Amino acid sequence: MSDSPNEITIDNSVLVLIDHQPWVAFSVKSIDAGLLVNNLAGIAASARALDVPIILTTVGAEGGGLKDPLINGITEVLPDVTPIDRVSTNAWEDIRPAVEATGRRTLLIAGLWTEVCLAQTAVSAIAEGYRVFFISDCSGGMSDEAHEDAKARLELLRRDGPTAAAFTFRAPFPAPGGSRSSQPVADDWFCPT
């Protein structure tokens, strides 16, 4: 497969979902909560079906007063993926070893809050030479303006990316050899009957 700087493939990408926890989501105003959960479950299921490595993070879930797990939509699809818990807003230092272990240099990042944890992590990864694509409809800010401003900053770095459905539909149907196809996932999450 091609691996050009503008190409996102199932073989060169890592999905990074940052802090999709109920207490963080409570203050998100830039996307409907139900839509956010649906999109997250859909992209997580797509990545799983396509064998794309997945890295999850939480903030303050262990040892903090909040002890807040991930949103149910994620844990239902990825019950065996253990989140990396941290205490700082920039997840990059904590997730870098997991990203490096995949051997992949393209990150598909979604997170809460867009303007804080997601933006800081994306900028740090870009500074280290990673290609970063922001998944807008699996992310949320504390206001529409904050979310849009963060998107604009990332777009200035020319690293804006797909929506959850666009990532799902990029996979070949059926996949070569019939082994990896996200068509059933796309049908379940993005084309409900």
PLM features per residue range, with description:
Residues 2-14, 50, 61-193:
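Active-site-adjacent betaalpha module
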Residues 11-13, 28-56:
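A short alpha/beta connector and helix-capping loop motif
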Residues 14-21:
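Short acidic catalytic loops
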Residues 20, 56-59, 136:
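A cross-domain feature marking catalytic cores of carbohydrate-active enzymes
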Residues 21-27:
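Short acidic, Gly/Ser-rich segments with clustered Asp/Glu that frequently serve as metal-coordination loops
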